[in-house]
Amino acid sequence: MEWLRISTSTELVRVATDEIVYVRADGNYSDMVLTNGKSRKMTFQLHFFDEVFQQLQNNMFVRVGRSLIVNKRYIYVINLTEQQLILSGGDLKEPIVFYGQSNANSPQNITLSREGLKMLKELLENEKGNDNG
């Protein structure tokens, strides 16, 4: 299990990467959402997490558009027609649904582009792994 350590001048946050479901942009901050449903506001922009996740050995995080980085472990459905991304599985109690630009009902206030979802789908289809899919 890999751990993510984020240090600021006033605190150190240490979290297992398996417990991170997604990180979303919120202006100059980012919200890290964990499997237990809790969200932690971090004083870093999303590009900081993008760089940190790229340095991890497990390669489990992927950026989906300008506002969102998701843990690939929790990707359940990518639906290009509905422009929908559903995260589920693991320790998540309920699925998390992100909608495309044509649907403003996303509870996470993030809209995903069709192109971003298409790239994510292709990335996962071309990955070599043990998931038979």
Question: What does each of the following model-derived ranges do?
Answer:
Residues 1-133:
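Basic, polyanion-interacting recognition surfaces, primarily
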